[in-house]
Curated annotation (Swiss-Prot):
Keyword Zinc-finger in annotation: yes
Protein family according to the UniProt entry: Belongs to the ELOF1 family.
Function, in words: Transcription elongation factor implicated in the maintenance of proper chromatin structure in actively transcribed regions.
Entry protein name: Transcription elongation factor 1 homolog
GO biological process assignments: transcription elongation by RNA polymerase II
Metal-binding among keywords: yes
SUPFAM superfamilies: Zinc beta-ribbon
Species per Swiss-Prot/TrEMBL record: Oryza sativa subsp. japonica (Rice)
GO-annotated molecular function: RNA polymerase II complex binding; zinc ion binding
Entry's Gene Ontology cellular component terms: transcription elongation factor complex
Residues holding Zn(2+): C25, C28, C49, C52
Record-linked Gene3D superfamilies: 2.20.25.190
Keywords: Metal-binding, Nucleus, Transcription, Transcription regulation, Zinc, Zinc-finger
Disulfide bond positions: none
């Protein structure tokens, strides 16, 4: 008589990688110079460049991550550039 087969252990869950909190500046193109901070008390997120002192602020919610603030900044820069291009043409 043999031993009863034991149930296989479930595979371990994969850990998600942390998202970046420092990014390259869209104005001076300096890598790792933009730092994002989230103030949950006042519901404000701020991205600022340490080199050229450019900054961007936006409203945040409980699910907002630093990459969201940076992405909004990039989107706003592109929107402003497109408006200026349309006015000049």
């Amino acid at each position: 008589m043999g031993k009863r087969k034991s149930a296989a252990k479930p595979p371990p869950k994969k850990r998600m990688d942390k998202l970046d909190t420092v990014f390259s500046c869209p104005f001076c193109n300096h890598g790792s110079s933009v730092e994002c901070r989230i103030d949950m008390k006042n519901l404000i997120g701020e991205a600022s460049c340490r080199i050229c002192q450019e900054n961007f602020s936006t409203t945040v919610n409980a699910l907002t991550e630093p990459i969201d603030i940076y992405s909004e900044w990039i989107d706003e820069c592109e929107r402003v550039n497109n408006v200026e291009d349309d006015d000049g043409a």
